[in-house]
Structure formats: structure tokens, C-alpha cells
Curated annotation (Swiss-Prot):
Pathway connected to this protein: Mycotoxin biosynthesis
Molecular function as annotated in GO: ABC-type transporter activity; ATP binding; ATP hydrolysis activity
Species of origin: Talaromyces islandicus (Penicillium islandicum)
One GO cellular component term noted in the UniProt record for this chain: fungal-type vacuole membrane
Protein name (database record): ABC-type transporter cctS
Gene3D superfamilies registered for this protein in UniProt: ABC transporter type 1, transmembrane domain, P-loop containing nucleotide triphosphate hydrolases
Domain ABC transporter, residue spans: 635-874, 1294-1533
Entry keywords, A to Z: ATP-binding, Glycoprotein, Membrane, Nucleotide-binding, Repeat, Transmembrane, Transmembrane helix, Transport, Virulence
Length: 1553
């Protein structure tokens, strides 16, 4: 059969019979059926091949990684959907009717009927019936989903029949054929409606084992039409419009997007390269996205083609009938809708890929983190310029999750721009421009291509400047984070002004870089808006001046529209290439991390048959790694202490030959930095094994473990407790089945009952980020409780008694470490509490500098002289405590909030009152609802500038829009001139009428048109447009920088001088978020998005006004359409804002859990919880992807409706022009059609940008909120009756006089009627049980709490009459938690740079830290003061505490206050510090020490015993010891085990007196 048509394709306002019969009725339907059959066969054989490898079993968490791939990778194939059965039965009837019609035409057709086309329709209908029959039998449902085939074929048939019906009605077809065609059209209309509107339902219900998946998501069950128009989101959008969305309102995530499905599938990909693995994994999605992008690329160019035809009709109406003109107008509407649907589907497919890419990459990174080796990062010296590059730091790994995965996932949604949209649209646009402008059109496209490098260059320059901004921002955030991390140290020392100056200096650098960024952003935006004008100038120059062509209306404005369409891919390709390069770099960083060396734990501990625990001639070391030549890791909390380093070379444990006693208590002791923590980690297999062997029976597969008996796993309690941001109970139970009896026994053993009873939510209280809502002692006890509750056979404890008082330590040791819960377990206990532990342990290992100095039983080591025999003499004094003897709660360092109880109410630890508030309610980060308050917006606007500034801004926006309109009006005038001349030349009647009626001179000949004149004016207008655009942006950015600087300084001031209670109540992460993300939005996003929003808003107003002025009737339609726009935008804004906020909220748990895994990977591996944490991470990622995808679905929901309304704008504009043909001249019609064509894109950008501005204003609201927090009263609360002496305090006497205070007005007093004296130059100890109020007393001394009653005097001066700065300079407090800053030792010892090298070195020597830090001196440096860029990463906790004490001694304050400052220091060093304090007292320093180690204060001059916030006892040590057995101090001494030593020291002191 010959398919070539000799007649015209279009004849007499309809398609020719040749096209209808040969193509629409025959070739297209048969080809589609053949393609469908081939696709079905390919899918069938492919599915059969895959089915051979499917494991039909399924478990939510597989027992191994490989098994998880087999079990989950193909679950989606069991999820086949179908049209409801009722509709399928109707389908059968309709297709049988279609076949009957074909038979009827074959029998009764006339001579003019093409039988081939009728036969083709019969064959295609039979194929449709065959597909339907297979669908009904469900015989192939596991292999091929045939429902989409039916939908596509019905739609294709309906589309062809639409044109056939049009031709049959307007042509001379036979009556039977016309009727049959109309009936067929009706049948396929019903079929299409059935398939387009029918919801999809699961063929089979979910299996009970498929517990990973919940109900189908809305988009899975939505109809085809609903998916094309995103109507499946209607319920959610309406719900968001009526009320604020909550997480519970969100739809289920599509199971094909779940991490538990996509991650195992991705792991099954075979290629080595991560990039090609991603391409292979998403190949089908990329092809679908490419298909939609291709359809969109063709559809967007249909309007300018139709516009040209319409304008030609307007110029010469006789060229076509009016019905053809209306066909053009209808085509504008249809093309706009098709382009909108294709564009939305293309973007949606990209976002689906982005979500799955994020899930895949986060899973890859997360599982790698759980397998990564532990690396130690040291400062590299000048002799070693290149840092080892073997390991990523924690900060870099976190950046992989937060930054790099986002770069890659976002780029995956835009790949179509590079490989489809840009090349296809460029080719189509070039062809159309060539048809319009000839060679000049090609020149125009060539110019756009030639200017593309300029776009890329500016984009790269902007990226480079942005990188500098990020670097400066990182420095500023790091400085502010350092303040927040050490805020107590800074406030205690009155260093706010100094550290504020440091931050502001970083801020000034950041503002300078931001100024550069804004300048380049202005250049970029000016270029963005000016390049189309430049291309237009040069194209028209060649077209009119060089080649002297006539540029009429029908040529100029379609060309402008085409250039406008091409501008989008040309501008987006520049950004896409930049983002693609950035994503490629990020992908490389991720791949590099994934290729890092993993932990050797499983190889070292691979001997599963061994029952020994210990080392055999083992030498172990820490790998020394860096990442990106970064020398020092970020200051992140870790569950391990990689800090015991005697030299710049990695620390080593050398020649270990140890056999720990099974089922016994093994104690590891030694001085600070000797390697105790490292030995425990080496036992876990976390250190690199140089030679020898490590023995520790270990199973690392969670599903092989029993939950009701001891298992071959290890419970690990690091020195700095690893606490999850879960409830206290969840931290203890740690994903094991809950056993109430065992749980109660654990709480009893670790003395947590009273603490839990003090919380309103009991054990359902959230521990906070890193345990931020718990005190140090509470965190250690929760960590120990986790170990006891576990079924682990081996327990490793790292100094877990250092943060509790002696009574509590005594209770924990005998009830937990030596209690029933430890029976049958092997315990390795690294500790400094040798007096308590050694007399009762079974085996001892003495360490010094990484070597075993001695090992054996206590008796053996005493006989060898390695242990003091006095320690063993106190053995009988321990264990006298009765069960349940502890009776206090630890509140000194816990969160002081209205939710804390004042007394030990009788509360069930296992049940919480359901009417009580959510435990998170008091600590959740504020999340504003609805629109941002006007007061916040007004605050920001006022800081931008005075009234004259706003007048100037409005003027610049107005003049810029006026000039923009002038460019097109001038083109119109230019084109009109050509139109007039053309009409004059070819229409003598028109020429005579014009001359006679209008008395005008005869127009010039075409060659006499002053093209250069029009070109010159156009160039001038364009230059003015570029200038005012650039100037406007600079003016706005000037105000933005001013506002950013002012608001940030107010934020910094407000937080720095906030009350200490603010930092107790608000988690550090929330405060840091204000200084990082919110400030970034304030600095960079508000102004840029606001400019674009205001510009587009002004442009939209200008377009509507202009079109209405040319076509007044359009105003009627415009009113209704604008109302529809407003309605759609209003209901969209609420949902988009809520989804964005929910996504921000759900992002935090992902980052938090990742941080917890990063810092606790050692504990996770020890407890064999890797698979559990991976599953939890996948759930959190799904919770993040759900609002993310819904947010982008709402964007597409909006996009389709905006495009539809935009198409209506273009349709009505064209309709009114055709309808009012006589009153609208072609040039004006061309201009209004041009603006109408651009309206849809503009309104879409406006709504999206407006939503972004609303979301960004939320950050402004959050920042402004923190500028209004309650401040400390820096000025004196009372007016002094005399001037403060210059040398105050000269003596250092302290007096508490009936002092009473409380944390908040609604809480009971924490100190009540405190009265005692501290004589000048004396040393006074404050002791008491945990929770007695000791630490609160230190806060009172520096007015961290203000007096409610009574007073505190220093040298007779009421401290309320002294400014805070002066007071805190006079009184130096050393807190229990060591505060160490970034910078060298010099910067840490002397932040104000007031002391000499000699003074600092002497102070280091006094606290016994000098020898330790000398080993870190790089090269041949003579002083240790300039080494260690970040001491927190190189010093152990005890050494960091020594550094803080050295800083305190260096200040030489008259009053020194130590708040349990030596709790983490070994006894020998503690004794040395006490000797230093004695030396200080000789020069008149008053020392107040809060202590748990009573032996260290035995020679103090006075002891004050606190109990329940009151002074229970006071006097000299000897006086308190002489009291009867009911004396609190004496009982504390007995419980400490040092009573005899304390009595001896006290007697010697009293004897000296």
C-alpha cells in the first residue's frame, strides 16, 4: 500500500482524505498495536528471567545484607493494579460494539469508503479485545501490566478519531461513514473516560508478611487523569487550606520510593562506578522523563507557529475562513494544556528520581558509617605538609549527607535539561526561526550559543563567590558554635565582649564576601534579562540592516516569542551544567568515602570458637587519617575517646599479653593518658592490629541472638556517655523486648529511680540531643543501665562512676557492677576510682604509656609493690550500704524547667498520665503556623532603610517595568511601519484611501525605511533597561546587607547576654540552627527571591493592564481568570508552606540519627545493632521523602492549573482578537498575544517565588524571636551607696546571708536560707549528696541566679550592687564540664592575651600538664603554647580539665570556685592540683571547692555540708568528723572508703593549728 499523498495534507479547512485514510485510520493504529505487542513480549520474557531469582520469602529486616537484596528487590512486582471489574465489563461491551461497527462498514460501505482503513480499525479493535481478555483472566499479571497499554491505545485512537470526525463533518464523506465515525468517537470517548477517571485498585490484598508496606499511596491508586492533573492531591491541598497540616495528615509514601525497597535493589547493581550504577538503576525513569521532555519541547513551540498563522489571517482575512482562525485559537489552548501536562510530568518524574537517589545515597553512606574504621586526626606539622588522606572526618561525612547527597539527588531531577530539552528545543527553535527569518534566524540561535559561555562564565564566577561566602559563613558559624558550646565558660569568665568581637570580625568578612556575591548576582540577573535583548538586537540588525528584509508584524512577534521560549533552556542549561559539575564533584566525594578502609573488627574477632577474652602479644595503633588535607576533625561528640596520645605519632598499645578472667570483674587502671580507653576499644577490635591477636567472642548478626539469655555480644559504656535523643526508657531498653521486672531491677541498680521520678513524664522523658536534658551523672547511669539491661555476655565500662558522688558511686558499684545483673558476665572496667574498685575486683591490669605495667589479682600486685597496701585495708568499710539507701535526685546540672518536679512524688516509672503534655512539648523547636506576622515583616522592612529608601526602590521597579514595555512597543512601531509600506506596495486601493482620507503624505518605499534609526532607539531602550535593572538590584542589596548586619548583631547580643536558664531549656541544636540556616536565609535568600517576586508581580500587572487596554472585552475574562489564579494560589500557599515546614522538621531526625550513628558506631557494632539502626534510618528517610515528594507534587498540582489558566488567557486573548477583528489592528494583536503567551510562565514563577518568600520569612521570624529573649541584668540590681573600690575584691572574703533563690518563679526554692562565711584566703569545701544544691551555689556566686531573699557579700560588698562583668572578673568558676576552645594552647590559656609565656608555662607545670603537651610540639618549636590547633581532639577529658584549671590559676582571681573540676582526673594528678591550690592560698586566694572526692578536701579550713538546698552542717573537717554517727559529713566519709585517711589528714592539720 502506498502511504504517500499526492494531494495537499490540508484542504478546505480540514485534513485531506489521504491523511485520514492512510495515516489516521490505518498506519498509526496498526503501528501502535504492533509496538504494544512487542513491548508486551519484551516485558514478559524479562519478567520471567527475573522471576528465576526471586525469593518469595520476605522479612522486614533481613538477616544479612545480601539476603535483604533478594527479599526486597522484587517485592513491587507482586503489586499489580487494575481497572475495577465493573468498568472492565463495560470495556468488553464497548469494544465489541466497535468491532461490530467495523463489520457493519465492511458490509454496507459505499464506493467512497476506504475499506483498508475499515479493516485496519477492525484489526486494532480485535487486538484491544485480546489485551482486555488477558487482563480479565489475570494470567499474566505477575509479568506484564497491560492496563497502561489499553489506556495508551484508547487515547491514541480517540485522538485520531477527533481529526477524522472533523474531516468527516466538513468534507463530503458518506452518511453511513460519518454516522459510524461519530459513534466510534463516542465509544472511544467513553473508553478513554473510563480509563482516565477509574481509580486503580490492588489486584490482590497484601500478604501478612509484607509488614514493611502499609496501605497503597494515593498516587498508586489514582486514576490516569488524576495522575496527569495531580488531582490525587486535592484532598491534602484542601485540608491544608482549612487547617495547618500535621505529619499524620500526609499520604503514605509510594512503596516504590521507600528506602527499604530501593536501597536493596541498588545494592544489587553490578557496576563498580557509582555514577554508572545510578544510571543503570534509573534508566527506565530517565527514558520516561526524556519522553515527557520531548513532548513538552514540541508542544511549547506550537503557540508561536499558530500565532503567526493567526496574525497572517488578521492581516489578510481572506486568506482563510473564520473557522480556521478559531481552529488556531483552539490550538493555542490545546497546545498550552499539552505542554503543561508534559512539563509537570517531566518535573514530577525528576523529583521521584531525586527522592529515590537520596534514599539510595543516604543508605549507602549510612551503612558505610556503621562499617567505617575509627580514625584519629592530628595536626600535621610543617615537615609533613600533606595530611594523610585515608579517612573522612566526622564533619566531612556529615557534609556528605547534608550537602553532597542533596547536590546529586537534586541534579538527578534536571538531567533532562542537558540531554533532551536543550538539544531538542534548540533544534526546533532554529528550524522555526529559519522559516521566519531565513539565515538571520540561524544567526540569532548562533548568537545565543555564542553567548552561552558568558552565562556559564558568570554562573561559575557566582559559584566561586558563593564558595567564598560559604567559607566565610563556616568560619562565622564555627565561631558562634564555639561560643554556644562553651557558653558557660564564657559567661562565668565575663568574656562575652571578647568572643562577640571575634564573631563580629568573622561576620564582617562574611558581609564583604556577600557584597561581592550580590554584585555578581546582580550582574547575572542583568545578563539573564538582557541577553534576549542582545540577541534580538543583533538578529534584527542582520535581518533589516544587513540583508534589508521587511520585518512585518507576523514575522517580528512570533520570532520574539520563539526567542523568549529558547531563552529558558539556554539560561537553564548554564545553571544545569554548573549544577551537573557540582553534583559530579559531590558524587566523587561520596564514592571516595564509600571506598575507604572499613573496620577490621570482624576480621580481628573472627574466631567464633574462642572463649578467651584478652590479647596475645598484640600491638595496636590508631590509624592517622585526614580528609581533603584537613588537619583536625570537627568538635563532635563521640562515644569513644581517641585522645590518649603521648606523641605526634599515632598512639600504640604495645606488647599486650592479657587474659581477662571470665565471668569476673577485671579492673583496668593507670594515670590519665595511659591508654585505658584505648585498651577497651582495642578489645572491641576498633584499633588497627599491627601484630598479635585479639580475643573477644562476638556475634554481629542481630537476628541470630537470643532475647532471653546472655548472648555473645558486648555492652560498651564509653567515658562520655553515648545517649540517643529518645526517651530514657528507650535508651535503656535499646530495641530489646521490654521486660518490666528486669527494667525495674536495672533502675534500682544504677540509682535512677529518684531521677526518673523527678520528671513529669517519668521514664518517657526525652533525653535530648546527646543527652542534653540530663546531667553528666544521669547520662553515665543511663548508659550503664543500657549495658545491664542488655543480654550481652561481655561488658566494657570506661570510667562510668566519674560524674557521680561517692554515695551513688558506692551504690552503683555494689548493685550494678558487682550486683546480680552482672552475674555470669565478664566485665572489663577502666576507672580512676581505685579505692572503690580494686579491693573488690577479681583481676587488675595496670597501664602506663600504652604498656602493661602489671597485672594479676589485687593481692599479687600489693605483694609486688605496684599497689598501695592501704587500699586493701579499706575493703571491709565498703558494701555497708543497704539496698535502696540512695534517696536523692541529681538536679545540679539537669534541665531546670517548669516541668521538673520539686520533690520526689510517688510516680510510676513505667506509666505516664495520658492527660499530661507530650514529653517533647517543652523542647520542640518553635514552628510557626500560618502566615508570618506583620510585626516581623515590619521589623525587617524598617531595618532595610528609611522612607526615602523605599521611595527610591519603588521608583526603580516602576521605571524598569516601563522600559521593559517600551522595548516591545518600539518593536511594534517598527513592525507597523513595515506593514504599512507592504500594504501600500501591494494594495493600490489602500494606498489611495490612505492618502485621500487621512491626508497623509505618500509613505516611503520599503528600502527608504530608516532601519538604523529604529535600531538605534531600540538599542538605547535596551541599554536603559539593563542599567536600571542593575541599579535596582544594587539598591535593594544595599538595604539587605544593612538589615542582615543589624539583625545578626542583635541576635548575637541577645543570645550572648541571655540568662543561663535559656541555655538549660533550649537544646543547643535549636540555637545553632538560628545562627546557621536561619541567618543564611536572612542574608542570601530574602532579598534575591523578593526582587524576583516583585519584578514578576509588576510584570503581571503590566501585562493585564496592557492587554485590557488593547482588547477591553478581555477585562471580563481577566477578572474571572485572575480570581481563579488568586484562589489556586491561596489554597496552594498554605499547603506548600506546611509541607516545607514539615520537611524541615523531618530532616532533623535524619541528621540527628546520622550524627548518633556517627558518634556511636562503636557502641552500635558492639551491641550488634547495625541492622536495627539501618532499618530505623530507612524509616526516617521515608518520613523525610514523604513531605518532600508531596511538596513537589503540590508544585506540579499548581503548575498544571497555572498552565491551564495561562492557556485560557492566551485562548481568550486570541478569541477576543478574532471576535473583534475590525477594531484591533494586527500589530496590537501581535503584541497582546506575545504578552499573553508569556503570562503563564510568569504567573507560575510568581506563585512559586511568593511561596518561597513566605517560607523564608519564617526564618526571619525565628531570628527576630531570639532577639527578644530575656537578658541577664548586667547593671547592678541595687544602687550602691558608695563607689566600688578599684582593687575590689582585695581580700576575697565571701559571706552568704540568709540567701534564698529559685530557678523560675513557678518553681520551689533550690537554695533556702543559706548562711555561712568564707574567711579571706581560706579554702572551703562544699559537699553533700547529689542534688543537694552544690552547683547551684556556684551559680549564685556569679549571679547566674538572682537572690530572692538575703544577699551574698564579697569583701562586704553586696554582689547585686556590682555589674556582672566586674563580678565575674573577680570570681573565677571552673565548671565540671571542661570548656576548650579552638586555637592553640596559648589561645585557650589566655584568650585576652594578658600573660607572658613564662607565666603560662609555669601554670601548665603546676597542673602537671606541661610534660603531656610537650610531646605535641611540631618540628623544632621551642614552646608548647603554639601547638595543637584544637586541643579538644588531642587531649583526654582529664587533660582538658587540667587545661581549664590552668586557665583559672593563671587569672589569679581573689576567689576561685571549683565545681567538681577534678572528677575526671586520676588521684595522683588531683593531689598535685591540691598542692598548687595550697600555694595559691599562701598569696591570699580564697578557694571554694565543690567536691565528691572527700580525701582531696581533708586539709581544707572549712567544710559546708548542703542537704536539700539548706546548710546542714558547717565547720572544720575535724569538728565535723568528731560528731556522732548521725553527722552527714561523717557518713559521706564512711561511704567514700577513705575515712581513716581523712581522719589522719584532718588530725595533722588541726595539730598544726
Amino acid at each position: 500500500m502506498n502511504f504517500r499523498c499526492s494531494s495537499p495534507l490540508w484542504y478546505d479547512d480540514h485534513l485531506s482524505d489521504c491523511v485520514v485514510n492512510h495515516y489516521l485510520s490505518t498506519l498509526i493504529p496498526l503501528t501502535a498495536c504492533l509496538a504494544s505487542a512487542i513491548a508486551c513480549l519484551i516485558s514478559y520474557f524479562h519478567a520471567r528471567q527475573n522471576a528465576k531469582h526471586i525469593d518469595t520469602g520476605f522479612h522486614p529486616v533481613a538477616s544479612s545484607e545480601d539476603e535483604a537484596v533478594d527479599q526486597i528487590a522484587h517485592v513491587s512486582q507482586q503489586y499489580i493494579t487494575a481497572i475495577p471489574p465493573v468498568i472492565e465489563k463495560l470495556e468488553v461491551a464497548l469494544i465489541l460494539a466497535e468491532i461490530s461497527i467495523a463489520i457493519f462498514l465492511l458490509i454496507f460501505s459505499g464506493e467512497n469508503t476506504d475499506l483498508t482503513s475499515v479493516f485496519a480499525s477492525a484489526v486494532s479493535s480485535i487486538y484491544l479485545l485480546l489485551i482486555l481478555f488477558v487482563r480479565l483472566t489475570r494470567s499474566l499479571q505477575s509479568y506484564v501490566d497491560l492496563q497502561p497499554h489499553s489506556s495508551v491505545l484508547y487515547t491514541l485512537q480517540w485522538t485520531c478519531l477527533t481529526a477524522i470526525v472533523h474531516a468527516a463533518i466538513l468534507g463530503n464523506s458518506e452518511r453511513n461513514f460519518t454516522i459510524a465515525t461519530l459513534v466510534r468517537f463516542a465509544l472511544f470517548t467513553f473508553l478513554c473516560l473510563f480509563h482516565w477517571t477509574a481509580p486503580r485498585i490492588p489486584v490482590e490484598p497484601y500478604d501478612e508478611d509484607h509488614v514493611l508496606f502499609l496501605d497503597p499511596s494515593e498516587d498508586e491508586t489514582a486514576s490516569l487523569l488524576s495522575r496527569m492533573t495531580f488531582s490525587w492531591l486535592d484532598k491534602l491541598v484542601w485540608k491544608a487550606y482549612r487547617a495547618t497540616l500535621q505529619v499524620s495528615d500526609l499520604y503514605q509514601l509510594n512503596h516504590n520510593h521507600r528506602s527499604g525497597v530501593v536501597a536493596p535493589r541498588f545494592k544489587n547493581t553490578a557496576t563498580n562506578s557509582l555514577l554508572w550504577r545510578l544510571f543503570g538503576f534509573f534508566k527506565s525513569d530517565l527514558l520516561w522523563q526524556g519522553a515527557w521532555a520531548t513532548l513538552n519541547s514540541f508542544a511549547v513551540f506550537v503557540p508561536p507557529v499558530l500565532m503567526r498563522s493567526l496574525l497572517e489571517y488578521l492581516e489578510v482575512p481572506d486568506l482563510a475562513s473564520q473557522s480556521t482562525a478559531w481552529l488556531y485559537v483552539t490550538g493555542l489552548l490545546v497546545a498550552g494544556i499539552v505542554a503543561g501536562v508534559a512539563g509537570c510530568q517531566c518535573d514530577w518524574k525528576g523529583r521521584e528520581m531525586a527522592a529515590r537517589t537520596r534514599a539510595v545515597l543516604i543508605n549507602e553512606i549510612y551503612t558505610k558509617v556503621l562499617r567505617k574504621g575509627v580514625a584519629l586526626h592530628l595536626q600535621t606539622n610543617s615537615e609533613q605538609p600533606e595530611a594523610a588522606d585515608n579517612f573522612a572526618s566526622d564533619g566531612n561525612i556529615f557534609n556528605l549527607l547534608t550537602v553532597d547527597t542533596e547536590h546529586v539527588s537534586e541534579m538527578s531531577g534536571y538531567l533532562y535539561l542537558v540531554w533532551i530539552t536543550f538539544p531538542v528545543q534548540t533544534a526546533i527553535g532554529t528550524y522555526l526561526l529559519y522559516r521566519l527569518l531565513g539565515i538571520s534566524g540561524i544567526v540569532g540561535v548562533a548568537l545565543m550559543l555564542g553567548l552561552l559561555p558568558l552565562n556559564i562564565l558568570i554562573s561559575r564566577r557566582l559559584v566561586a563567590v558563593q564558595a567564598r561566602v560559604l567559607t566565610a559563613s563556616d568560619a562565622r558559624i564555627q565561631a558562634s558554635s564555639e561560643i554556644l558550646n562553651n557558653v558557660r565558660t564564657i559567661k562565668y569568665s565575663a568574656w562575652e565582649a571578647v568572643f562577640k568581637k571575634r564573631v563580629l570580625s568573622k561576620r564582617r568578612i562574611e558581609l564583604v564576601e556577600m557584597r561581592s556575591r550580590f554584585i555578581w548576582w546582580s550582574i547575572n540577573m542583568t545578563t539573564f534579562f538582557s541577553l534576549p535583548l542582545i540577541v534580538t538586537i543583533l538578529t534584527l540588525f542582520f535581518y533589516t540592516v544587513v540583508w534589508d528584509n521587511s520585518m512585518g508584524t507576523a514575522v517580528a512577534f512570533p520570532a520574539l516569542v520563539i526567542f523568549s521560549i529558547l531563552r529558558i533552556p539556554f539560561n537553564r542549561i548554564a545553571d544545569a551544567i554548573t549544577f551537573l559539575l557540582r553534583a559530579h564533584v559531590s558524587l566523587g566525594r561520596i564514592e571516595k568515602f564509600l571506598q575507604e578502609q572499613e573496620t577490621g573488627k570482624y576480621e580481628q574477632l573472627s574466631r567464633t570458637d574462642s572463649v578467651e577474652v584478652g590479647f596475645n602479644n598484640a600491638t595496636l595503633t590508631w590509624p592517622n587519617g585526614g580528609f581533603g588535607n584537613k588537619a583536625v576533625t570537627e568538635n563532635k561528640r563521640s562515644d569513644i575517646q581517641l585522645t590518649e596520645l603521648p606523641s605526634m605519632r599515632p598512639f600504640k598499645l604495645k606488647g599486650l599479653n592479657i587474659r581477662f578472667q571470665p565471668g569476673a570483674l577485671n579492673v583496668i587502671c593507670g594515670p590519665s593518658g595511659s591508654g585505658k580507653s584505648s585498651l577497651l576499644l582495642a578489645l572491641l577490635g576498633e584499633m588497627a592490629l599491627v601484630n598479635g591477636q585479639v580475643f573477644l567472642p562476638h556475634k554481629h548478626n542481630w537476628h541470630e541472638l537470643s532475647t532471653d539469655s546472655l548472648t555473645e555480644t558486648t555492652a560498651y559504656c564509653p567515658q562520655e556517655a553515648w545517649i540517643l535523643n529518645r526517651t530514657i526508657r528507650a535508651n535503656i531498653v535499646f530495641d530489646l523486648p521490654f521486660d518490666g521486672r528486669r527494667y525495674e531491677a536495672v533502675l534500682e541498680a544504677v540509682a535512677l529511680r529518684p531521677d526518673i521520678a523527678s520528671f513529669d513524664q517519668g521514664d518517657q522523658t526525652l533525653a535530648g540531643e546527646g543527652g542534653s536534658r540530663l546531667s553528666g551523672g544521669q547520662k553515665q547511669r543511663v548508659s550503664l543501665a543500657r549495658a545491664l539491661y542488655s543480654r550481652s555476655k561481655y561488658v566494657l565500662l570506661d570510667d562510668c562512676l566519674s560524674a557521680v558522688d561517692s554515695k551513688t558511686a558506692n551504690h552503683i558499684f555494689f548493685h550494678a557492677v558487682k550486683g546480680d545483673l552482672m552475674q555470669g558476665r565478664t566485665c572489663m572496667f577502666a576507672t580512676n576510682s581505685i579505692q572503690l574498685t580494686i579491693p573488690h575486683c577479681d583481676y587488675i591490669v595496670l597501664l602506663d604509656d600504652g604498656r602493661v605495667r602489671g597485672q594479676g589479682t589485687a593481692e599479687e600486685l600489693v605483694s609486688e609493690g605496684r599497689i598501695d597496701a592501704d587500699i586493701m585495708q579499706n575493703k571491709a568499710e565498703f558494701g555497708s550500704e543497704k539496698p535502696g539507701a540512695y534517696d536523692t535526685i541529681e538536679l545540679d546540672h539537669a534541665i531546670k524547667s517548669p516541668s521538673s518536679r520539686s520533690s520526689l512524688d510517688t510516680v510510676s516509672l513505667l506509666e505516664v498520665d495520658p492527660q499530661q503534655e507530650d514529653p517533647e512539648a517543652g523542647y520542640e523547636e518553635s514552628k510557626a503556623e500560618g502566615a508570618v506576622a506583620w510585626s516581623v515583616i515590619r521589623t525587617y522592612l524598617v531595618t532595610l532603610g528609611p522612607p526615602w529608601y523605599w521611595v527610591l526602590v519603588l521608583f526603580m521597579f516602576g521605571i524598569q517595568q516601563f522600559i521593559s514595555l517600551a522595548t516591545n512597543i518600539w518593536i511594534k512601531e517598527w513592525a507597523v511601519r513595515y506593514d504599512m509600506l507592504d500594504n501600500f506596495a501591494f494594495d493600490p486601493i489602500q494606498r489611495n484611501a490612505t492618502t485621500r482620507d487621512e491626508t497623509l503624505d505618500e509613505p516611503e518605499e520599503p528600502q527608504k525605511v530608516q532601519a538604523r534609526y529604529y535600531m538605534a532607539i531600540y538599542v538605547a531602550i535596551c541599554l536603559a533597561y539593563a542599567f536600571f535593572t542593575f541599579a535596582r538590584d544594587l539598591i535593594v542589596f544595599y538595604g539587605s546587607l544593612k538589615a542582615s548586619s543589624e539583625i545578626y548583631e542583635r541576635l548575637l547580643n541577645s543570645v550572648l547576654f541571655a540568662k543561663l536558664l535559656f541555655f538549660d531549656r533550649i537544646p543547643l541544636g535549636q540555637i545553632t540552627n538560628r545562627f546557621s540556616r536561619d541567618v543564611e536565609v536572612l542574608d542570601q535568600n530574602i532579598s534575591t527571591f523578593s526582587i524576583n517576586t516583585l519584578q514578576i508581580a509588576a510584570s503581571l500587572v503590566m501585562i493585564i493592564v496592557f492587554i485590557s487596554s488593547v482588547v477591553p472585552a478581555f477585562l471580563i475574562a481577566a477578572v474571572f481568570i485572575c480570581v481563579a489564579y488568586w484562589f489556586v494560589m491561596t489554597i496552594f500557599i498554605n499547603g506548600a508552606r506546611d509541607l516545607r515546614r514539615i520537611e524541615s522538621v523531618e530532616r532533623s531526625p535524619v541528621y540527628q540519627q546520622f550524627s548518633e550513628a556517627l558518634s556511636g558506631c562503636v557502641s552500635i557494632r558492639a551491641y550488634a545493632r547495625a541492622s536495627i539502626f539501618t532499618a530505623q534510618n530507612q524509616v526516617l528517610v521515608d518520613r523525610l521523602n514523604s513531605p518532600y515528594l508531596l511538596q513537589w507534587a503540590s508544585q506540579q498540582w499548581l503548575g498544571f492549573r497555572v498552565n491551564f489558566l495561562g492557556s485560557l488567557i492566551l485562548f481568550f486573548t486570541g478569541a477576543f482578537v478574532v471576535w473583534d477583528l475590525e477594531s484591533v489592528d494586527p500589530s496590537s494583536a501581535a503584541l497582546v498575544l506575545t504578552y499573553a503567551a508569556m503570562f503563564s510562565e510568569s504567573i507560575m514563577w510568581f506563585v512559586q517565588l511568593y511561596a518561597i518568600v513566605q517560607q523564608n520569612l519564617n526564618s526571619v521570624e525565628r531570628v527576630v524571636e531570639y532577639t527578644e529573649i530575656e537578658q541577664e541584668a548586667n547593671q547592678p540590681l541595687k544602687r550602691a551607696v558608695y563607689d566600688l573600690p578599684e582593687d575590689w575584691p582585695s581580700r576575697g572574703g565571701v559571706r552568704f546571708d540568709a540567701y534564698t533563690t529559685r530557678y523560675a518563679p513557678e518553681l520551689p526554692p533550690v537554695l533556702n536560707d543559706i548562711t555561712f562565711n568564707v574567711p579571706p584566703g581560706k579554702r572551703v569545701a562544699v559537699v553533700g549528696r547529689t542534688g543537694a544544691g552544690k552547683s547551684t551555689l556556684t551559680l549564685a556566686l556569679i549571679r547566674g541566679l538572682e537572690a530572692e531573699l538575703g544577699r551574698i557579700e564579697i569583701d562586704g560588698i553586696d554582689i547585686s550592687e556590682v555589674t556582672l562583668d566586674r563580678l565575674r572578673q573577680a570570681v573565677t568558676v571552673v565548671p565540671q564540664d571542661p570548656g576548650v576552645f579552638r586555637g592553640t594552647l596559648r589561645d585557650n590559656l589566655d584568650p585576652l592575651h594578658l600573660y607572658s609565656n613564662e607565666e603560662m608555662i609555669e601554670t601548665l607545670r603546676a597542673v602537671r600538664l606541661l610534660d603531656a603537651v610537650r610531646t605535641y610540639i611540631p618540628g623544632n618549636s621551642a614552646t608548647p603554647l603554639d601547638c595543637l590547633d584544637h586541643p579538644a581532639n588531642a587531649l583526654s577529658r582529664g587533660q582538658r580539665q587540667l587545661l581549664c584549671i590552668a586557665r583559672t590559676l593563671l587569672r589569679r582571681s581573689r576567689v576561685l570556685v571549683f565545681d567538681e573540676a577534678t572528677a575526671s582526673i586520676d588521684h595522683t594528678t588531683d593531689a598535685a592540683i591540691q598542692e598548687s591550690l595550697r600555694a595559691s592560698v599562701t598569696v591570699g586566694t580564697t578557694v571554694i571547692t565543690v567536691a565528691h572526692r572527700l580525701l582531696t578536701i581533708a586539709d581544707y579550713d572549712k567544710v559546708v555540708v548542703l542537704d536539700a538546698g539548706c546548710v546542714a552542717e558547717q565547720g572544720s573537717v575535724q569538728e565535723l568528723l568528731d560528731r556522732d554517727d548521725d553527722g552527714i559529713f561523717r557518713r559521706l566519709c564512711v561511704q567514700s572508703g577513705d575515712l581513716e585517711k581523712i581522719e589522719r589528714v584532718a588530725a595533722e592539720k588541726s595539730g598544726r593549728k
